[in-house]
């Protein structure tokens, strides 16, 4: 799986709402913050993300802050963002 350039990522993100280019552990990543009414809804969302990630065999970094969940996607083996990350972002 080939690592994408920042320009390729920006173009690919245009149809995927609210995801943005970022950096995680020195590698290019994409991330999005999801907001919920309360902690219970946030955790229910995290559980759905976990199921989807297990099915896909591709796991985001998940940061939980009460009613906010920040997901960060990057393909660690490739050292940056690949099509796997964009597919997961679009599915969420």
Swiss-Prot record:
HAMAP family associated with the record: Pterin_4_alpha
Q: Which InterPro entries match?
A: PCD_sf (IPR036428), Pterin_deHydtase (IPR001533)
Q: Which family does it belong to?
A: Belongs to the pterin-4-alpha-carbinolamine dehydratase family.
From the Swiss-Prot or TrEMBL record, what is one GO molecular function term?
4-alpha-hydroxytetrahydrobiopterin dehydratase activity
Sorted UniProt keywords: Lyase
Q: Which GO terms describe its biological process?
A: tetrahydrobiopterin biosynthetic process
Q: What class of enzyme is it?
A: lyase
| EC nos | 4.2.1.96
Keyword Lyase attached? yes
Catalytic activity reported: (4aS,6R)-4a-hydroxy-L-erythro-5,6,7,8-tetrahydrobiopterin = (6R)-L-erythro-6,7-dihydrobiopterin + H2O
Q: What is this protein called?
A: Putative pterin-4-alpha-carbinolamine dehydratase 2
What would be one Pfam family of this protein? Pterin_4a
